[in-house]
Structures are given as C-alpha cells and as structure tokens.
C-alpha cells in the first residue's frame, strides 16, 4: 500500500485530490514506517494498544502523511515523548487517551448538566463577579470539550475545524468518529449503511477514489483537455 500511495506523487491530476495540493496539503507524501519496537514503546507510554488496522498502517505504510482529507497526523517521538503532530487547530489531550470513550448519552448528559449551571448576571452583585463566574464556567466547557474525546486519537483534519477521531478504548474501539463540533454539531460515528467504519476501510476507500482522480482527473479536466 505504501508504494501505491507514493506513486501518486507523479500523477497528472494530483492537485485535484482534496487535501493533496502542493504547498497546502499532504502531496501524497508519507512519513517512514515505525518499527515494532517504536510502536510498542508508544503504546506503553500512552497507556493504550492501537487498533490492529491502525497499528499495521504505522508499521507497514507510514507514521502519518497522505490520507483522507488533509492527511493522517504523524505519530512522532521527541523530547516531549510520543505524540501526534496535529497542527495548531487541534487540542487533543494524550493524558485522556487511556480513559473510556464516552457514549453519546454520557456526552449529552454532560452538556445538559453544564448548560444548566451557566451563570446568569442577575444572580451576581456586580458585573465583575458575574464575569469571573462566567469565565470559570467557560473554562469548564474547554475541559468538557476535551473529555468528550477521551479514549480517542485525532487522526485527520477535514478542514473548517472538522476532525476525524479513532476510538481506542471501550465498546467503540476501532470505530472512526466525525467531529462536527466546530459548527455546533456533535461527534458522530462514521458509518457505511448500518455498519461502523474502521481505519482500514476508511483508508482504502480514500486511496481507491484518490488514485482514480489523481490519474484520470475530473470530468471538467477531461473536457478542458478536449478543447
């Protein structure tokens, strides 16, 4: 699979594939694969075992790079230890990775409980005390936002603040979730009909479509070439 992806670097319609554009996207580049010792060390440090399909990807395809949307965030090791190079718009917390991924019902309950505690200005003696209370409440939202993806890896940025997460703990382990919270949406499982979608099918589906588009171009490109 690694060779299939890297071969697309020379495809004639490379820049028509979303997220692959030179200078702005992954350009069908891949990080080197990790060794078994490196993957094991990452799992031990992070306190989780990676789902098998993602683990195989790290070992055989690459630590990150070309993939759906703007690519797969690379898993790297530096003075900070093992972490994903996620970019400036992501705020995932690896300290939460070993915790159970919350259910939809749990996430909804947490939101409802926090909303019910929103400070109301008439309840405070002055504007300063109200703003202090509101600031503390808003900080709780930041914590809740992170808690909602406990037990999941942020894999990919879809653009516009939307992300794809891979669950690594609990009953949903191995399932991908789409994060639509940037537009006041929710975390939703990625599905194909009635079935949850895991890493392997997600990546292979992307590769099939990306290869076709990169090599053949869109209908608009074909029409331009006929003129």
Residue locations for each model-derived region?
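A surface-exposed partner-binding patch
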Residues: 1-154
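Short, intrinsically disordered/low-complexity patches at protein termini
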Residues: 74-76, 178, 187-189
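A residue-identity detector for tryptophan
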Residues: 82-84, 110, 137, 141, ...
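Low-complexity, glycine/alanine/valine/leucine- and proline-rich hydrophobic stretches
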Residues: 154, 162-186
